[in-house]
C-alpha cells in the first residue's frame, strides 16, 4: 500500500516513468511517507545514509557511474541545507542529481513550528530547476503537480545532467498508507536534436587556418572520455594534445580499464618546461579547449600568457568559460562529437595534402609530450606519499578492470602523475568534502573494485562515509602525513608561521579505530618494507570486507619528494 498523499504518489510514479532507479534516503519523520513509497516500488532501490552531507555525495557517486539520474531524499529543515556541497559539485560536474525534500505546509513556515525554514529555492543557483509541489485538492492542482515534477525531471537530464530540487510539502497526519496503487501519470519527454555539422563551421575555419593549433582536454564524464580518447589518439599525430587523468578513459565494457592502453600518464610540468626552453617560438596561435576544469595550475598560467592565441571552447550548454582569457567562441555541443567531426575533416585534408600546420611546431610539441610521458616512469624518491602512490600504480593488476577515485589537493595531483586510466574526482568545485562518500556511493553500484586515493584531512572530514553498509569492492588508500600537506607547496606560505599552524591543521589521528568500529579491514605502513607488504594485502582479491590501507609519512619528506620529482623532470 502507498501513502494517501497525492503529491507524493504523483512524484513516485513520475520518478519511475523518468527512469530513476536509485534513491539515497536519510532518516526523518516528515519524509517518511516519501521513503515508504519509494521502498514499495520494485523499480527503485533505496540506500539508507544517515549523514545528509555524506548522503548527497553518495548519490553523486552513484550518478557518476552511469550518468543516470539518482535521487537523494531528506526531511525538512537544515537537512536540506546539508546537501548544498554535493549539489554545487553536481552542478559544475554536470551530474543528474535529484534532491527531494519533505516540507511542512506553507501555512506553518516562519511560525516558530519545529524543523522549518524557507525551503523553496533554498539551493539557489546551484540547481537548474527548483519546484515546490502543491498538495492537490482538485484536477487542476493535480495537473499542476504533474507538470512541476515533469519540469524538474526533464531539466535534470538536459545538457549532460544537472541537479534539480523537488520540495514536497506534507501536511499532518503524515502516516496513512491506504492507497493500493500509484496513479497513471503523464510523462513529458524532451528529445535532444541531432548535432548539426553546420554549427561546427565557424570554429573549424579558424582551426584549419591556424599554423600552430593546440588541443587541451579538461575533465569529462567517463563515458564521453572514452570516445574523446579514440579521437585524441588520431588527432595527436598532427596536432599536439594536452590531457590529464580526468580527461581520457579506456573502455570499461571490454575490461580495458587496467590494460594500460589508455593515452597517458602525461607530466604536463615536464612538457611545459621543454616548451619554454625551446629556441624558437612554439606557442600556439589557436587553442581548442574541450571539457571541464584542469588540475594543472601551471598549464592554465602558461596558456593565459599567450595573448595572441584564439581560443574556442566546447561544452554542453554553451557556457562562456574564458579560462585562458583569450576566448573567441563557444561551441554548444558534445565534445566527443566535435572531435569526431574534426577527425573526419582532418583525414580529408591529409588525403588532399591541404594541411597548413607548422611541422616544426608539431615536432617540438610531440618531442616534449613524449618526454612528459617518459618522465613519469623513472622517479627516484625516498619513502613518501609520492613513492607510495607510484608503487600502488605499479602493482595495480593489469588482468582485471577497476575504477579509480581520488580526493582533491595532493591526492589527485599524485594520481595525475601515474594513473594509467581514467580517474573520477570532484573537480567541479575542488573541495575536500565528500570525496570518500562519492567513492563509497560509486562502489555500491559498480561491478568492479573501486580504489580511492585520499588524504588524511579529506578522509577524517568525511569518515561518516564508512557508516552505511558497504560492499567488499571499496578499497581506500589513505595518505596520512598528519596535516594538509599541499600547503607546504604554496610559495610564500612558509613565511607565515601563524598561517602554517592554522591552515595545515596538524593532528595525530589514525583511521584504525574508525575502521574497527565500522567493520572494515585495516592495514597500515610506516616505511618502505611495510608499504610493499601492505600493498600486496591491499590488492588481494580474497578480501571479504572493504579495506583501508593507511600509509603514514612525514610531511616534510613528502614536500621534499614532490619538489625533487619536479626538479628531476
List where the protein language model places each region.
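Thiamine diphosphate
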Residues: 100, 107-120, 417-569
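A short, small-residue-rich loop immediately preceding and capping a beta-strand
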Residues: 21-24, 45-47, 65-104, 282-291, ...
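Glycine-rich, anion-gripping cofactor-binding loops and their flanking helix/strand elements
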Residues: 82, 217-312, 420-446, 460-464, ...
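Active-site diphosphate/adenylate-binding microenvironment
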Residues: 8-11, 16, 29-30, 34-38, ...
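Phosphate/pyrophosphate-binding active-site segments
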Residues: 1-2, 302-410, 512-514, 526-569
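Conformationally flexible catalytic loops at phosphate/diphosphate-handling active centers
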Residues: 148-151, 155-209
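Glycine-rich, acidic loop regions that bind phosphate or pyrophosphate groups
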Residues: 101-152, 243-366, 469-471, 490-491
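N-terminal cofactor/phosphate-binding cores enriched in small/glycine residues
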Residues: 2-88
Amino acid at each position: 500500500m502507498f501513502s494517501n498523499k497525492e503529491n507524493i504518489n504523483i512524484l513516485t510514479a513520475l520518478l519511475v516513468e523518468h527512469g530513476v532507479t536509485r534513491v539515497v534516503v536519510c532518516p526523518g519523520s516528515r519524509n517518511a511517507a516519501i521513503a515508504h513509497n519509494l521502498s514499495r516500488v520494485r523499480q527503485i532501490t533505496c540506500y539508507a545514509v544517515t549523514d545528509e552531507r555524506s548522503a548527497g555525495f553518495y548519490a553523486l557517486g552513484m550518478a557518476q557511474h552511469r550518468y543516470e539520474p539518482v535521487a537523494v531524499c531528506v526531511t525538512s529543515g537544515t537537512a536540506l541545507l546539508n546537501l548544498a556541497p554535493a549539489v554545487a559539485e553536481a552542478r559544475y560536474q554536470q551530474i543528474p542529481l535529484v534532491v527531494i525534500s519533505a516540507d511542512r505546509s506553507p501555512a506553518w513556515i516562519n511560525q516558530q513550528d519545529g524543523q522549518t525554514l524557507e525551503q523553496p529555492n533554498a539551493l539557489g543557483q546551484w540547481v537548474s530547476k527548483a519546484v515546490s509541489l502543491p498538495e492537490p485538492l482538485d484536477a487542476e492542482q493535480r495537473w499542476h503537480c504533474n507538470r512541476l515534477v515533469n519540469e524538474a525531471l526533464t531539466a535534470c537530464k538536459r545538457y549532460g545532467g544537472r541537479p534539480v530540487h523537488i520540495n514536497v510539502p506534507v501536511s499532518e497526519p503524515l502516516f496513512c498508507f491506504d492507497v493500493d496503487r500509484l496513479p497513471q501519470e503523464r510523462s513529458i519527454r524532451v528529445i535532444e536534436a541531432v548535432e548539426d555539422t553546420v554549427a561546427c563551421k565557424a570554429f573549424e575555419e579558424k582551426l584549419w587556418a591556424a599554423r600552430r593549433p593546440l588541443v587541451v582536454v579538461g575533465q569529462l564524464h567517463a563515458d564521453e572520455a572514452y570516445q574523446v580518447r579514440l579521437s585524441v589518439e588520431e588527432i595527436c599525430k598532427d596536432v599536439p594534445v594536452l590531457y590529464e587523468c580526468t580527461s581520457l578513459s579506456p573502455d570499461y565494457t571490454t575490461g580495458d580499464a587496467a590494460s594500460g592502453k589508455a593515452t597517458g600518464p602525461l607530466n604536463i610540468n615536464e612538457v611545459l618546461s621543454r616548451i619554454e626552453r625551446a629556441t624558437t617560438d612554439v606557442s600556439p596561435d589557436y587553442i581548442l579547449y574541450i571539457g571541464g576544469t584542469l588540475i594543472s595550475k601551471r598549464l592554465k598560467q602558461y596558456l593565459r600568457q599567450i595573448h595572441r592565441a584564439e581560443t574556442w571552447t566546447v561544452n554542453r550548454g554553451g557556457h562562456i568559460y574564458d579560462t585562458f582569457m583569450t576566448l573567441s567562441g563557444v561551441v554548444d555541443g558534445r565534445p566527443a562529437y566535435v572531435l569526431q567531426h574534426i577527425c573526419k575533416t582532418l583525414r580529408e585534408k591529409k588525403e588532399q595534402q591541404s594541411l597548413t600546420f607548422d611541422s616544426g611546431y608539431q615536432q617540438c610539441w610531440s618531442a616534449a609530450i613524449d618526454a612528459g610521458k617518459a618522465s613519469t616512469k623513472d622517479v627516484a624518491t625516498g619513502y613518501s606519499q609520492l613513492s607510495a602512490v607510484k608503487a600502488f600504480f605499479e602493482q595495480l593488476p593489469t588482468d582485471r578492470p577497476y575504477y579509480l577515485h581520488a580526493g582533491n589537493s595532493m591526492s589527485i595531483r599524485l594520481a595525475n602523475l601515474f594513473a594509467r586510466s581514467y580517474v573520477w574526482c570532484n573537480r567541479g568545485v575542488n573541495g575536500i568534502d565528500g570525496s570518500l562518500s562519492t567513492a563509497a556511493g560509486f562502489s555500491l553500484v559498480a561491478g568492479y573494485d573501486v580504489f580511492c586515493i585520499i588524504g588524511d584531512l579529506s578522509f577524517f572530514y568525511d569518515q561518516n562515509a564508512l557508516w552505511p553498509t558497504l560492499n567488499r569492492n571499496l578499497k581506500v588508500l589513505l595518505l596520512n602525513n598528519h596535516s594538509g600537506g599541499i600547503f607546504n607547496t604554496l610559495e610564500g606560505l612558509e613565511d607565515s608561521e601563524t598561517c602554517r599552524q592554522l591552515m595545515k591543521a596538524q593532528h595525530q589521528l589514525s583511521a584504525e579505530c574508525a575502521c574497527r568500529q565500522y567493520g572494515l579491514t585495516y592495514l597500515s605502513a610506516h616505511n618502505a618494507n611495510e608499504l610493499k607488504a601492505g600493498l600486496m594485502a591491499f590488492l588481494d582479491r580474497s578480501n571479504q570486507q572493504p579495506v583501508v590501507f593507511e600509509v603514514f609519512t612525514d610531511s616534510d619528506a613528502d614536500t621534499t619528494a614532490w619538489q625533487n620529482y619536479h626538479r628531476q623532470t
